[in-house]
Amino acid sequence: MDKTLKFTDSHEWVRDNGDGTATIGISEHAQEMLGDVVFVDLPDVEDEVEAGESFSLVESVKAASDIYSPITGEVVEINEELEDSPELINEEPYEGGWIVKVKLSDPSELDDLKDAEEYLSSIEEE
């Protein structure tokens, strides 16, 4: 697992891209709980997302799960690959399975998220 990632209690991850944007996806643990992903409902570019608010929906063979934004900002890119290949979320949750890139409104929000170590210990307790 990439140690630069930050995580939420609802199993989303964030990667600070170092240019005022951040990439968001769901964790390996989340995709394992969901099972085979069959559809991802993506937001539109220029949509505003708010920390703690749902911005996407991932449907699997088992369930549909809202995806919550860990940060506030504006969607600057969506992963269009997921429209044809939603299984990328299962195969590469931290690489090809990213969901959106967001221009950060408040970079300090990243400080409120768990680092990889904290996240891993929290899911071991579940």
From Swiss-Prot:
Query: Which Cys residues form disulphide pairs?
Result: none
Gene Ontology biological process: glycine decarboxylation via glycine cleavage system
Tell me what this protein is called. Answer: Glycine cleavage system H protein
InterPro entries documented for this protein: Biotin_lipoyl (IPR000089), GCV_H (IPR002930), GCV_H/Fam206 (IPR033753), GCV_H_sub (IPR017453), Single_hybrid_motif (IPR011053)
The highest taxon in the source lineage is: Bacteria
GO CC terms for this protein?
cytosol; glycine cleavage complex
Question: What is the native source organism of this protein?
Answer: Vibrio campbellii (strain ATCC BAA-1116)
Which UniProt key words apply to this protein? Lipoyl
Q: Which cofactor does it need?
A: (R)-lipoate
Q: Which residues does the UniProt record annotate as the domain Lipoyl-binding?
A: 21-103
Subunit structure comment from the entry = The glycine cleavage system is composed of four proteins: P, T, L and H.
Q: What does this protein do?
A: The glycine cleavage system catalyzes the degradation of glycine. The H protein shuttles the methylamine group of glycine from the P protein to the T protein.
